[in-house]
Amino acid sequence: MAHQFFIDKRLHNALTFSEYVEKMKLDSEISDLSKLSDKEKEDFPMVQLNYQRVSRILRTYKIDEELLGLIKKISSPQIWMVISEAWCGDSAQNLPYIAKIAEHNPLINLRIVLRDSNLDIMDLYLANGTSRSIPKLVAFDENGNELFQWGARPKEAQELVVRLKNEGMEKEKFLEELHLWYGRDRGRTLENELKEILQNSIK
């Protein structure tokens, strides 16, 4: 049964990826920070950095051929929801790949739901039942039936974070290690996880 937010077309009316990136660009270029809230001021450096990350991935990424074949096998309309925010480093390192992958099949309608203004939707997809972790990808058919989920990080990246936290590493340092991992991986682990998901979900 479809969720109420799907029935109410909130997902269908959410941002396209192009709109999301344009908003991110404009937010990263604000010159007068005095007009921002305290939270927006705090997030501003991350939005700037994440816009650079997104731009680099969009410029350099080339899809894996096996994944491309699976994406092209999707033969009926799907809507892919990604819950995200511009300040989130994990979103910047994963969402551009998801967007470029989705581009290869016109039957995939990718929509970006902003977490902080849609917490009721986010709370349907908590990590471990407690954490509002993003990005979160959820795919639906045109009737709102859920097809698959992914997120908020590739499994290997999540295991790295858990290990470093358990070793007592400070947040600033383990985030640095995490983004070094993303830089080396270049989306390949995400691709492999999506390949496995699609192999199991494509009828």
Region locations from a protein language model:
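Conserved beta-strand and immediately adjacent loop positions that scaffold enzyme active sites
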Residues: 136
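A short linear-motif detector with a strong N-terminal bias
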Residues: 58-61, 89-92, 115-118
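Beta-rich catalytic cores
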Residues: 133
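Short, surface-exposed basic-aromatic patches at helix termini and helix-loop junctions that form
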Residues: 96-106, 128-130
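Local sequence-structure signature of Cys/Sec-based thiol-disulfide redox active-site neighborhoods
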Residues: 69-100
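Non-globular targeting/processing and membrane-anchoring segments
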Residues: 1-77, 123-130, 142-203
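Thiol-based oxidoreductase modules, predominantly thioredoxin-like and allied folds used
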Residues: 80-85, 98, 106-122, 140-142
